[in-house]
Amino acid sequence: MSKHTERIVFFIRQKLQLPALYVRAAALLLLALLLLRHRTAAAAGVVSGIHTCLGTLIPSLFPFILLACLCTNSRAAQVLFRPLSPVMRHVFRLPACAAPAVLLGLTAGYPTGAKITANLYAAGKLTREQAARLLCFCTAPGYAFAAAYTGSLLLRSDRIGLNLFFACALAPLLLGLILSRFAEKPEKSLKSPEAAPGGIVSAVQDGIKATVSLCGFVLVFSMLLAVLHDAGIFQFLCGFLSRFGYTVPLSGALLTMGLEITAGVTQCIYWHLPVYFLAFGLGFSGVCIHLQIFSFFHKAGLPLSKTRYVLARFLNGLLSAAFYLLLSYFLPANTSVAVETSPLNTAPMAGSAASSLALITLSVFFLLTCILRSGKTPSKICGGNSTGKMLQ
């Protein structure tokens, strides 16, 4: 880039900073007015968020967050995952220490994999490029949320829950496999595993801090959703989307899932929307989960391109929906599902198995096109630049 071009870019950035500051100030003022005007709804939203944290989030997530912290501090955990070293090195082109992030991230649920990735980067075991690439395919709802909670408990169908779980696990694996084709194979480490001092104590402390942080984000988004509903802003947005052909239930469910996945799943089931919308939402994971992941990497000192990460999550959501359609075609759900969920289970699908394969192919083609245009650097999609550094 020439000096003249750099001056033009710098001038444009300087001119855009002031309007952006005014927009943020206006948004802060609007938020303050909404909280003062609808303080009762805000309090009710906080209470609802507390019930979600105490009844669902903490019991189901804290054990895996603790396990994630132990996996990065314990020598025994590194030995346990050593058999996966060839797979990580030759298939995903990552060091062996990344195995817990992939395995636990796909099975234990978000944001376990992101937490392990942030810990590995903070410990110097992953480069910036490796951490950025790993982050793109180590985040999934896990078995407890996708299969047990959404499938068995809410939908009362074990088969649908398993299809959701495997769809949300296969999608990030495909992304990781594609991104690894454009990365260099890491050198084989000859060092023996090292254990951090005070592994168990520090793991418990880190697990508690991470869980409290996650609960804080859930409370904030639960409060915001309640305020938006009470102020009529949420209904206005649903009506606006309905002008583009979206039904009001679909608009509300998509908006809710885009913000907070737990409430979004409930909305989808309440309005009896097709299950592939659930698969998309579980694959995308929602802004609440995204902010939780951003907080991990901010503490680890790793700048992250938020726009590119959200784009990767959107592609992951599309692939999850396509994989669910494919799995439900070959492994259809049992017909003996509860009557309450029958409209959801029998809702018309978006297409056949052929259309699902077409959607997967188009998503892969789009991802490959983005990678090739960015100079064959997978971290461009995840948040890094050609030198392995992340973009702000």
Where are the predicted features?
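Alpha-helical membrane segments and immediately flanking helix-loop junctions
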Residues: 91-155, 254-270, 276-301, 309-314
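Alpha-helical transmembrane segments of multi-pass small-molecule/ion transporters
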Residues: 65, 118, 135-139, 143-193, ...
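Transmembrane helical segments that form the transport core of multi-pass membrane transport proteins
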Residues: 76, 204, 208-282
